[in-house]
Amino acid sequence: MSFNNKKPMIKPSVFLADGCRVIGDVSIGDDSSLWFNVVCRADVNSIKIGSRTNIQDNTIIHVNHKGPKVLIGNSVTVGHQVILHGCKVKDQSLIGMGSCLLDGVVVGEKSIVAAGSLL
């Protein structure tokens, strides 16, 4: 869905489950998947999701107007009901279910964030 003349750029191989909302300045790489009721809202800044990344059910990805963009690397798994806000998750990382990552957080390559974490 476009917002303020910004339209998502979604590769043809991306899977978007029912109820998924991708809004504004969002780019999603090859073979990634966004599952049921995921919201990617890039209304005031951009969101970039790499290739082969899996965003599971009920996750919210959002940005802050004056804060950092959201950058999610390649081959990342984001568990159910995660909130990612203005953060960076590097390649081959796992974000556990119910975690909340706030503005400025950087998760390193091949890292695991335990379920229910607040960073």
Which residues are covered by each model-predicted region?
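Extreme N-terminal tail/first-helix region
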Residues: 1-14
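Left-handed beta-helix
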Residues: 12, 17-18, 23-24, 29-30, ...
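Phosphate/pyrophosphate-binding betaalpha-module
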Residues: 46
